[in-house]
Amino acid sequence: MACPAHGCVKDCLEVELDKNMKILIVDDFSTMRRIIKNLLRDLGFTNTVEADDGTTALPILNLGHIDFLVTDWNMPGMTGIELLRHVRADEKLKHLPVLMVTAEAKREQIIEAAQAGVNGYVVKPFTAIALKDKIEKIFERIG
């Protein structure tokens, strides 16, 4: 039977992403936040909020209205990996999908992020297509 949304036969590989989901972008570099926000907007995601580090992001997350977290690794205050660990340790936040967007391409750091529970990892610089692919893969996996 064909999928009604896409006409796919068997397993539908297209993911229906909620374009209105609220996305928190965390990066200490305002230009990078703007780049990510613009790329997300180009992909149809316009409901974004921003924080400049993990310390600023946590209160926003604790309000409970964020559907997806995009965070840098290297930030002053609380780093992205520390933020990820806080999210995974919090009963209300532990299922929140998290994408790490960072210049850190070392194998050890990718492994550390995976062990801390990241859902996806993109190394800067990246394209809108790479970002779209990562987001789709994350939401395919979490179903």
Q: Could you tell me what each predicted segment is?
A:
Residues 50-59, 80:
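Helix N-cap/capping motif at the beta->alpha junctions
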Residues 59, 81-94:
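Short amphipathic alpha-helix used as the core "switch/output" element in two-component signaling
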Residues 75:
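Receiver (REC) domain active-site loop signature in two-component systems and cognate sites
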